């Protein structure tokens, strides 16, 4: 006898093909579907006699990489500070903020100007780090059993964090005001809370002048010198306080001799008056 292979009917072949497809869906590493959730939905639709269609959507990125990817934290805010200030003073014919920042960074003579933003950004970061470190140290010293104290300290940490943010905003606001006044008047203000042993008034003035001449190609007028009154001694002040014309008239009056006065007697002779 000759073994003749059994021929499958079209219906049987379709069922086998579907079974292979379902097995592939369950075992494939590329299938990112939630099969348990899919089975629940299909069973529900089957019980309710509702027609359904399964659609396949490609996943553009690997889900594992998406879950492991952490949010990028930008610690360097120099450009953010520069952009916030530059966009307020920018003229239509000037380069855009990103182009100007690239130009400023690539110019060696503008290194001091970039340092201004770097130093200010570090000051703001120190304020944030100070509040974060203090809150973490307080939380580490709390026993696990004292939940009420934990809530109180958490509220205190939130208040401290809020205060730190307000101080940093105030720092940046005064920093922008300092740059605007220096840019408009070609000289830094006499007093500012931004000044320290590094960022001095002379340093800010010279750095802004370099930015205007090198980056913006603007003519910088000489800074207006502040008027300081010269102290005057008391005797000299009294002498110079009287006008020259008045002094001459006083001298003339002193040299003039007063005329002699003629005195007339009040005694009158007796006239022909009756007794």
From Swiss-Prot:
Stretches with biased composition (Polar residues):
265-275
State the name under which the record lists this protein.
Protein pp31
A GO cellular component term found in this entry reads: virogenic stroma
- Region Nuclear localization signal: start and end of each range? 68-72
Q: Which UniProt keywords apply?
A: DNA-binding, Early protein, Host nucleus, Phosphoprotein
Segments of this protein annotated with the region Disordered: 227-275
Write out the function statement from the record.
Plays a role in both early and late gene expression.
Note the Pfam families from the entry.
Answer: Baculo_PP31 (PF05311)
Please give the superkingdom of this protein's source.
Viruses
Where in or outside the cell it occurs: the entry states: Host nucleus
PTM annotation: Phosphorylated.
Alphabetized GO MF terms: DNA binding
